[in-house]
Amino acid sequence: MGIRLGMHADNWRGQSGSFNDAVASAVKYDLKYLEAGTVNGQYFVSELGYDPSISILSNPVQIKRLLDENGLTLSMLDASYPIFGPQGSYYGIQYYTQVIRFAKELGAPKVDSVDSGNAPDLPKNEMLKITIGNYTEILKWAHDYNIIICIEPHGPYTGDGEFMLKLLGHFEDEHLRVNFDTGNTFIQGHDPLEYYKFLEKYIVSSHIKDVDEGLAAMCRGEETGIGCSPVSIGEGVNADNIRNVLLYMKERNFDGDVSIECDASEENIRKSVAWIRNVLGD
């Protein structure tokens, strides 16, 4: 199928928009794939229509009907609660197992996960050991429901290539893969294309995120990830890196999803979709 272009409904969070707003925009720009963030429980802001997250307590049949009526498929559910370390053990496992169930009900083939912040009081080998245990439990559900669990570079551990290879290599499991992120890897100080190649064996999807000049000057090499960027794809300092990654994906006949992440102003979405389609020659 090749590269499947979609976008993340979370783009509407900064706009106080709803999941329905994201659906309408995807239809407007002829995108067939949408990614959505999840919450555990009821978030009143979402229910009032001012946040695009989906509660895993929602009626999945109703959501699936909305997507089907608009010709959309969920590419991934973005659970993104820190699953690394003790925090993941206490709170993350039970959440991810239920997101896996919800993903299956919605027809989403993947669930995204992230690491925690740096834990200076916990040696890295201990963090790895605990995290392996956490994913071991999650993967039991992933196997039963045939859902791919993605690990996204978003923090100090996922930005550490050696740590990532130890974690992924421990399992060598087709149900544990990587959701790449062009913006986070740039902020971490990586050359996104080089880090993409380093993890390429495991990558099944990618967030496409540019970075504005001011944010890059303030955060690059100091932070490990950003939620969103105010600039459209192609208008930030990460544009050349994104182009290189996309062209490399195309050259390598990548078969998977790429999901636009930018603040969802009308102009940003329009420009981002057009820029990526131009790069890919679509």
What spans do the regions from the language model cover?
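Active-site acidic/histidine proton-transfer and metal-coordination neighborhood
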Residues: 21-24, 60-70, 83-178, 239-243
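Histidine-acidic metal/acid-base catalytic patches
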Residues: 1-33, 68-70, 107, 158-282
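Conserved beta-strand positions in the central sheet of alpha/beta enzyme cores
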Residues: 35, 76-78, 112, 150, ...
